[in-house]
Amino acid sequence: MGENTGNQNAKQLAEAWKQTAEHLRKRYNSFGGKILSRKDWGLAQIHDTLLVRAVAKQDWIDYVLPKLDLDKMTDESTGLPFTDKSIQKALSQVYDNISTEGMATFKPGTNSYGKTFANRRTDHRFLAFKNADAWMEYQTRFGNPDPFVTMMEHINGMSRD
């Protein structure tokens, strides 16, 4: 997540991961994808649908919102920074998509829950956490806190897509 731990091995691993993730992004795009590069992107999020479903939508929003760096996020409907109202609406949609495994936006007769191939993986870069601790806290509560598992699942998913 761009934070210096002082551990040279961790720094080398982070650089190798950054190169791998960038290679996967470019490869995906070469086959018709449309994932934009984010200099601040570190790791994907793994969302455990059952853990997310177990809490009320507003409770999930109240938990995740203080962990996000809104300066790194853009309201896709306006292209502008989020307002208090628009971030609530966006996170409500994120909750719906996670808790329904994408079925909230599914349109009959389409594939990938209404998303074109090009846009299929753009959602995975929407949440921008303030730092590694905020990411880890979210993953511990609603995903998988093991960064290695997250990396391997990201590689697997990107390779299959």
Label the model's feature ranges.
Residues M1-D161:
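Structural preference for well-ordered, secondary-structure-rich domains
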